From Swiss-Prot:
Protein name: Indolepyruvate oxidoreductase subunit IorB
Assembly and oligomerization: Heterodimer of the IorA and IorB subunits.
GO molecular function: indolepyruvate ferredoxin oxidoreductase activity
Statement: the UniProt record of this protein carries the keyword Oxidoreductase: yes
Length: 202
């Protein structure tokens, strides 16, 4: 496999960089060359954050070029739209459905797009696939809202063409989190897997 490119986005405090590092570590353990990159200086709470995970046999540079992302994994719907130009034609946008309206929306200076609008843009302009579910709700069900990132990673492992096996990624997460957090993270991962299987009719 030449390369597989993931763009992870959301707002500060959602665990985006942790998710990028977990996926990068899983790809490394699977024997791929890996590059993980992030945009610094914007990760204050509620500020826009973007991270890149690139892996394969032939990967150079940490930044995913525009139009080259196989997947945009978004922790917040409008953030997927903000970085939509990274998506390749026929790519996948997988997002947490729960919005965190930007300041401009809160102040009445902008309107927040519906999931239907975002889906239309992904499908019509990028010939892509759009999947959204309430990952935060499942993280709370698992036992801690902070595991939203792990719910999303679990879901990602079920998407068509994703090169890393769910069991492999799950094991890396198990080894990476503190011992007392293993159970809640494993449950979060499994709930993400289940949600994706239901959405994808697997």
């Amino acid at each position: 496999m030449k390369e597989y490119n993931i763009v992870i986005t959301g707002v500060g405090g959602q665990g985006i960089l942790t998710a990028a590092n977990l996926l990068g570590w899983a790809a490394l353990k699977a024997g791929y060359k890996v590059r993980v990159g992030e945009v610094h200086g914007m990760s204050q709470r509620f500020g826009s954050v973007i991270a890149y995970v690139r892996f394969g046999d032939d990967v150079y540079g940490a930044m995913v070029p525009e139009g080259k992302a196989d997947v945009i994994l978004s922790f917040e719907p409008v953030e997927a739209l903000r970085y939509i130009n990274y998506l390749k034609k026929g790519g996948l946008v997988f997002t947490n459905a729960r919005p965190i309206p930007p300041v401009q929306v809160s102040m009445g200076l902008a309107t927040y797009p519906s999931l239907e609008e975002i889906k239309r843009i992904v499908e019509e302009e990028f010939n892509g696939k759009f999947l959204a579910f309430d990952a935060e709700k499942l993280a709370i069900e698992a036992g801690n809202v902070i595991t939203t990132n792990v719910v999303l990673i679990g879901a990602l492992t079920q998407t068509p063409g994703f090169p890393l096996s769910a069991e492999h990624v799950k094991e890396v997460i198990r080894l990476s989190v503190p011992p007392k957090a293993v159970d809640v993270n494993m449950k979060a991962f499994d709930l993400g897997v289940k949600a994706a299987k239901e959405m994808l009719n697997l």
